[in-house]
């Protein structure tokens, strides 16, 4: 009876331990066979934070250009566009400022 329980536990523990080692190796390795950096996945939150801070800095700029909050034409995401590339004041006027 005890040997059956021991075999069942070993059959359960070994795959879990192997999976745990594989996961730890991914996190701790500096690069994989394709040259990708696994640690870069951890920095994705930083890119999101940078995007969010860019969007927050963009709000006062839009207010200074339009005199009001952005009212994007055609559903354009102004923060996505202007945080990935530089946007001119003319571009912001074109897509954000309400038509007179």
Swiss-Prot record:
One GO location term (cellular component): extracellular region
Signal sequence range: 1-18
Location (main, coarse): secreted
Annotated compartments: Secreted
Keywords in alphabetical order: Disulfide bond, Secreted, Signal
Cystine crosslinks: 54-83, 66-96, 70-97, 82-87
Gene Ontology molecular functions: hormone activity
GO biological process: dauer larval development
InterPro entries: Insulin-like_regulatory (IPR052335), Insulin-like_sf (IPR036438), Insulin_CS (IPR022353), Nem_insulin-like_b-type (IPR003235)
Top-level lineage group: Eukaryota
Family: Belongs to the insulin family.
Protein name: Putative insulin-like peptide beta-type 6
Organism: Caenorhabditis elegans
